[in-house]
């Protein structure tokens, strides 16, 4: 078995006039959390998008369980078990909470979507997050913190989750929601899931919640 779950070696990515990533190295062991801290414009978002297949690196290599991977797009990364919670919710406001949570992981009953299974599954995940949001609620009607919890729930609904990247996930959460989030993070680590926790220098999580930075 490979020592590292995810590795980046010499990754570079540039945009016109800007070198966003310069020889980035990352070694992520199973069941560990790494804090990636930096100011705005330091390349944190580009880093996420390279790992999740949104951007393609110009140089360097990425390995998953010791095998080289070359994601052609976000779907490839998702199928490999890599998920991301972004700073600003990317949920669909015109869809319900349940529809958002099961987006890309829809359950079917015959030729039709199984709305009952979606509703029950959404309730179960939201209870784990200590949120009693009705699954039929439109996401656009929720406050920003609740939308972020729906985003987290959608990623937790990924059965083959291996690596979770969290981009300033607490920025729109209440103190109580942050406490729940850190509890969930510890549960994920115990299950062997690896986490990359991205934050600004002055909003870094407690040292006890991260193992490397």
Short names for language-model regions:
Residues 60-71, 76-80:
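Conserved ABC transporter NBD signature motif
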Residues 2, 70-75, 107-128, 132-136, ...:
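Short coil-to-helix "N-cap" segments within the ABC nucleotide-binding domain's helical subdomain
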Residues 52:
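Helix-to-loop junction immediately C-terminal to a conserved catalytic motif
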Residues 202, 207-213:
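Single conserved hydrophobic/aromatic residue that forms the stacking wall/gate
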Residues 37-39:
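The feature captures the beta-strand-to-loop junction immediately N-terminal to the Walker
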Residues 164-168:
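Catalytic Walker B motif of ABC-type/P-loop ATPase nucleotide-binding domains
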């Amino acid at each position: 078995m490979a020592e590292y779950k995810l590795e980046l070696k010499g990754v570079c990515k540039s945009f016109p006039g800007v070198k966003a990533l310069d020889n980035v190295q990352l070694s992520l062991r199973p069941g560990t959390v790494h804090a990636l801290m930096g100011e705005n414009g330091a390349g944190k978002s580009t880093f996420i998008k390279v790992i999740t297949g949104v951007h393609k690196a110009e140089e360097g290599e990425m390995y998953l369980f010791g095998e080289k991977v070359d994601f052609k797009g976000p779907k490839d990364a998702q199928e490999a078990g890599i998920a991301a919670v972004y700073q600003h919710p990317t949920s669909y406001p015109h869809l319900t909470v349940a529809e958002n949570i099961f987006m890309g992981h829809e359950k079917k009953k015959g030729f039709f979507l199984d709305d009952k299974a979606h509703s029950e599954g959404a309730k179960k995940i939201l209870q784990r997050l200590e949120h009693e949001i009705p699954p039929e609620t439109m996401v656009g009607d929720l406050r920003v913190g609740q939308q972020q919890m729906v985003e987290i729930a959608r990623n937790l609904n990924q059965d083959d989750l291996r690596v979770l990247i969290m981009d300033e996930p607490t920025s729109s959460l209440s103190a109580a929601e942050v406490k729940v989030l850190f509890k969930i993070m510890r549960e994920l680590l115990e299950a062997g899931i690896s986490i990359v926790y991205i934050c600004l220098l002055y909003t870094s999580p407690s040292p006890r919640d991260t193992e490397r930075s």
